[in-house]
């Protein structure tokens, strides 16, 4: 992909121009809908695991270079810092009217490119992490309960014109829709309730077009669901849990791709273990939490350390308030546990997921589950906030690396001044961590965006998702609630599809 020659980005240290010029792109008009949301890296992280000492953070990507203030053509503000040559546009901002006549909900969170129509139009489904309150959407919007304000919105984005074409409420009346997962056939988004509030704690399926049924998938478990990664061949769902003592789960549908017919819920267990195994990385605070619940302490883990795993059935996947929780049931059967499971993404036979405050420093772990080998491996652990600050949502980039959304509040000095805002951080298959983008949102008084003014640089990134050809990255700012579309010379670095003169294999099967 090449950018227009008249938009070279920044001069050294200067802001990039506030416009998107796509006139030289060759874009098909219309076309049939195709599957999306399936990044296909060439390799897993075996190269990294073979040489764990090489896993390190670079201050600047040697391929993409420094980050510069880059202006948004819609707001006129430098909301993001990006490498030279990259451009973006904001859209779908909280409180702006949607196509169905209702205000855009706040708290943008998990998201996925669910379908693509030719090479021009992209269908996104986006979560809104809202709790109690009035459901959003016009009359007729599918609503789970009448006292919850969370849900999902669908958006159609025109790549050729870099603008939002249409958006609407697709699910409402749910509670704290945090992350979720894309259906690999491009049919739907699976939205997760991150709560165990009475009557909530389920996952819901939302179609690319139209609206959801608002029927919870009860047999997939009632717990603080965070994210879902769907394996292509089997249709199995791999799910994270956001809790201090959190399981990692597999849901086997009775009928492939028909989630509402139910299925079997299982929890991951370290094979041949004599009881629960604590994989929190040995942090003292988290070990105290485990001990208080009668669970074993964790220990520090080596980069590349791996565990052969198996799965145990959960007897009661939809427990009532007086019943043992899903995690308690699994732990009683020897299940493994983490701390605050967050983002998850499937690609080429592996599920990658994060533990946002896992590890000795409580700044985050990144795990890989090799489905065929049934082996779980620690591929990264952050030693401090500057290296990686509590990874949350995650996606696999077309070039094979991971892109991690930070949710640690930014990095501040002793005087509480920002050293840097929250970042989108790349992790290459060679084990190098590097900054790709930085939250630079500072909104002037009297000109609110999403109902907010002031310094928002510490607010989290969420919902990172690429188009299948790798030319566009869509990502959310949780608060004030903005969706960004980013494009540029991806092929220059490890996130891009083109590497060393060769194209990454698109085949998702090994």
Identify the residue ranges that each predicted region occupies.
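N-terminal secretory signal peptides
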Residues: 1-23
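Conserved blade-ending motifs and adjacent loop-strand segments that build the rim/top face
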Residues: 380-392, 433-463
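Loop/turn-rich, solvent-exposed surfaces of beta-rich toroidal or solenoidal domains
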Residues: 356, 386-432
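Signature of short aromatic-glycine-proline-rich micro-motifs recurring in repeat-based ectodomains
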Residues: 103-112, 334-343, 390-393, 450-468
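N-terminal export signals
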Residues: 14-20, 26-49
């Amino acid at each position: 992909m090449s950018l227009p020659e008249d938009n070279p980005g920044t001069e050294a240290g200067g802001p990039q121009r506030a416009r998107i010029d796509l006139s030289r792109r060759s874009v098909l008009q219309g076309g049939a809908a195709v599957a999306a949301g399936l990044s296909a890296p060439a390799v897993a992280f075996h190269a990294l695991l073979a040489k764990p000492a090489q896993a390190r953070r670079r201050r600047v990507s040697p391929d993409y270079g420094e980050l510069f203030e880059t202006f948004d053509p819609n707001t006129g503000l430098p909301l993001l810092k990006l490498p030279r040559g990259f451009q973006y546009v904001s859209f779908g901002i909280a409180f702006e009217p949607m196509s169905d006549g209702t205000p855009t909900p706040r708290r943008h969170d998990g998201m996925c490119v669910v379908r693509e129509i030719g090479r021009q139009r992209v269908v996104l489904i986006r979560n809104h992490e809202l709790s109690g309150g009035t459901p959003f959407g016009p009359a007729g919007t599918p609503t789970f309960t009448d006292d919850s304000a969370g849900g999902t919105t669908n958006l159609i984005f025109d790549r050729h014109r870099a603008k939002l074409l249409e958006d609407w409420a697709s699910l409402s009346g749910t509670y704290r829709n945090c992350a979720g997962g894309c259906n690999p056939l491009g049919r739907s988004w699976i939205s997760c309730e991150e709560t165990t509030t009475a009557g909530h704690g389920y996952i819901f399926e939302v179609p690319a077009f139209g609206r959801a049924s608002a029927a919870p998938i009860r047999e997939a478990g009632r717990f603080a669901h965070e994210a879902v990664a769907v394996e292509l061949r089997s249709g199995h769902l791999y799910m994270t849990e956001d809790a201090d003592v959190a399981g990692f789960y597999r849901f086997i549908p009775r009928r492939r791709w028909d989630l509402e017919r139910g299925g079997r819920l299982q929890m991951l267990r370290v094979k041949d273990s004599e009881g629960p195994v604590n994989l929190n990385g040995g942090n003292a605070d988290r070990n105290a939490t485990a001990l208080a619940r009668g669970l074993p302490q964790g220990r520090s883990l080596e980069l590349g350390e791996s565990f052969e795993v198996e799965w145990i059935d959960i007897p009661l996947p939809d427990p009532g308030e007086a019943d043992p929780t899903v995690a308690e049931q699994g732990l009683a059967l020897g299940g493994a546990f983490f701390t605050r499971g967050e983002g998850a993404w499937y690609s080429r036979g592996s599920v990658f997921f994060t533990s946002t405050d896992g590890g000795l420093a409580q700044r985050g772990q990144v795990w890989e589950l090799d489905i065929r080998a049934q082996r779980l491996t620690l591929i990264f652990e952050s030693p401090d906030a500057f290296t990686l600050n509590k990874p949350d949502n995650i996606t696999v980039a077309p070039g094979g690396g991971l892109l991690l959304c930070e949710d640690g509040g930014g990095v501040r000095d002793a005087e509480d001044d920002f050293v840097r805002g929250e970042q989108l951080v790349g992790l290459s298959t060679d084990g190098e961590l590097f900054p790709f983008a930085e939250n630079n949102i500072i909104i002037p008084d009297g000109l609110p965006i999403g109902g907010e003014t002031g310094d928002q640089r510490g607010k989290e990134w969420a919902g990172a998702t690429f188009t299948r050809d790798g030319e566009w990255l869509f990502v959310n700012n949780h608060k004030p609630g903005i969706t960004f579309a980013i494009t540029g010379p991806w092929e220059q670095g490890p996130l891009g599809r083109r590497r060393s003169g060769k194209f990454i294999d698109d085949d998702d099967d090994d």
